[in-house]
């Protein structure tokens, strides 16, 4: 996927890392568009507070990308496109937006203290101008029935 949005951190964009070293790296994953949000999310991954992420299912279908698979490793990049960490997917669930629970919201590492707070932030992101432009749908909205991909991961290595 393009550096597009996953949850308020949307933008899971696996691609290969070339020319960064002689050792092979797992595919790249990008959290959000480059900028302050991505930098915040990457910092939360590096300090261990971010261990989950959420994407709309439509993000995967737009890019014709398969869903994450448990055990898959990905290289996290920062806003400068520098490889900073390797994460490993530990669980994947596709569910309606209304079913996201507090633990998943908290584990996104953005300081959410309620599902309502998490959802409001994610709705702003998913219904924001950048996401709508990326999706090619200026009227894109989410509701309780919108299918989302709930992914959990662990930090494997800081690069």
Where are these regions (language model features)?
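Mixed-charge, low-complexity intrinsically disordered regions
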Residues: 1-86, 92-159
């Amino acid at each position: 996927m393009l550096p597009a949005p996953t949850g308020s951190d949307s933008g899971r964009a696996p691609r290969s890392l070339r020319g960064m070293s002689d050792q092979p790296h797992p595919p790249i994953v990008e959290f959000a568009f480059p900028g302050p949000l991505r930098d915040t999310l990457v910092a939360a991954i590096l300090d261990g507070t971010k261990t989950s992420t959420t994407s709309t299912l439509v993000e995967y279908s737009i890019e014709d990308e398969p869903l994450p698979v448990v055990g898959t490793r990905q290289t996290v990049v920062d806003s400068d496109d520098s490889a900073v960490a390797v994460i490993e997917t530990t669980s994947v669930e596709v569910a309606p937006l209304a079913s996201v629970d507090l633990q998943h919201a908290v584990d996104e590492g953005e300081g959410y203290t309620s599902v309502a707070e998490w959802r409001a932030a994610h709705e702003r992101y998913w219904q924001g101008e950048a996401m709508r432009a990326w999706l090619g749908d200026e009227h894109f909205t989410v509701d309780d029935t919108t299918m989302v991909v709930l992914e959990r991961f662990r930090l494997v290595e800081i690069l």
